Curated annotation (Swiss-Prot):
It comes from the Eukaryota. Residues 124-135 have a biased composition (Basic and acidic residues). One of its GO terms (cellular component) is cytoplasm. The keyword Cytoplasm applies. This is Protein ATC1/LIC4. It comes from Candida glabrata (strain ATCC 2001 / BCRC 20586 / JCM 3761 / NBRC 0622 / NRRL Y-65 / CBS 138) (Yeast). Residues 149-161 have a biased composition (Low complexity). The gene is ATC1. Residues 101-135, 148-167, 319-348 are annotated as: Disordered. Residues 332-342 have a biased composition (Polar residues). Keywords: Cytoplasm, Nucleus. Involved in cation homeostasis and in the regulation of the cation stress signaling cascades. It is found in: Cytoplasm; Nucleus.
Length: 348
């Protein structure tokens, strides 16, 4: 309904604009033309209704409500601009307009109340959130202060690395300190049986101590016993002064040492990359030089082939010259005896 009413109002305004386009139009003649039966038959019902509304509004505004118009508008003819500038109550006296205004004012009041409520709720929610955040921060700080500071375990080595072996050594030394000091009694070695005959080998009893492997085991056990005797509670302080304990896997010292090792490895890898780049550049230069030498060798081979051809041609020319010279010599040798014979005949 609202859309239809708005469309109707727009159509009425367009018609008003057409009628009131010119200031010199006679409104009475226009109204008489609009009331004519020939025009009303061709127009639709909506146009007729709007024309009737326009007539009513024009009559009310032009004759009865002259007091409400200003001095400037009384002298001039009524146009669309003047009608639009006037209040809606003067042109269209409808009760629906007042109802819409009341409804809009009520809606505005309700919206203002709802906005205040929402602002109050948002402020209370923000305060609650801030309080909860402060409580959570305090709890987190307390938990962090109570925790023990440890190094990251991700940097600790695997069980197969050197760090685990060093840890095992330290643990074995600590266990050895707690062992009793009772020395082991030396074992009496039995005397070896002397061989009198080679047939008495079956009667000889071979002791385990005579075997070289068993002797090695006994020696190792004796060395371990001596080490355990040296590590006593009285001499532990001196031993700690002389020998530096290696850092445990979970301490910060171990992580620092690991970081230093990683830095060294990174530097070494960087050096290797630089050396590789230098080698690569030298290899590229060597390849370029090799290519140039190959091209020079090909050119020299071609030049050598040309020289060989020239040499063969020169040899042929030399042979021809030699043949020509030999022919001349033979001819000269034959001509000399003939001349001598002729001279002798002439003398005779």
């Amino acid at each position: 309904m609202k859309a239809q009413s708005s469309q109707e109002q727009e159509d009425g305004l367009t018609m008003l604009h057409r009628i009131l386009k010119d200031d010199n139009v006679d409104m009475d003649s226009a109204l008489s033309d609009m009331e004519g039966p020939s025009v009303n038959q061709n127009l639709d019902k909506l146009e007729i209704d709007y024309r009737n509304q326009f007539e009513i509004a024009y009559r009310e505004n032009s004759f009865e409500n002259l007091e409400e118009l200003s001095d400037e508008t009384i002298g001039k003819h009524v146009t669309l601009d003047t009608l639009l500038k006037m209040d809606n109550d003067v042109i269209f006296k409808d009760e629906n307009i007042f109802d819409d205004e009341d409804r809009s004012s009520r809606k505005r009041q309700r919206d203002s109340v709802s906005d205040t409520d929402t602002l109050f709720n948002e402020q209370t929610d923000s305060k609650k959130r801030k309080d909860s955040d402060m409580d959570s921060c305090k709890n987190a700080i307390d938990s962090i202060m109570t925790e023990q500071i440890l190094s990251p375990i991700s940097l600790s080595p695997t069980p197969s690395s050197d760090g685990s072996i060093q840890n095992d050594k330290t643990e074995s030394l600590e266990i050895a300190k707690d062992l009793p000091k009772e020395p082991r009694k030396p074992v009496d070695k039995p005397a070896r049986a002397k061989l009198k005959n080679k047939y008495e080998m079956s009667n000889i009893i071979i002791h385990k101590e005579d075997i070289p492997a068993a002797n090695l085991r006994n020696r190792r056990s004796m060395v371990d016993n001596n080490v355990i005797k040296k590590i006593s509670p009285h001499s532990s302080a001196d031993h700690n002064k002389t020998v530096k304990k290696e850092p445990v896997v979970i301490t910060n010292e171990y992580t620092v040492s690991q970081v230093a090792q990683m830095k060294r490895r990174i530097i070494d890898s960087h050096k290797l990359l630089l050396n590789f780049n230098v080698i690569k550049d030298n290899y590229a230069r060597a390849c370029v030089q090799l290519k140039r030498s190959v091209t020079a060798l090909k050119d020299s081979e071609i030049h050598r082939a040309h020289l060989i051809l020239e040499n063969e041609e020169l040899k042929k020319q030399l042979q021809a010259l030699q043949q020509h010279s030999t022919g001349k010599e033979e001819a000269n040798s034959t001509n000399i005896p003939k001349q001598n014979i002729l001279k002798n005949e002439a003398d005779s």
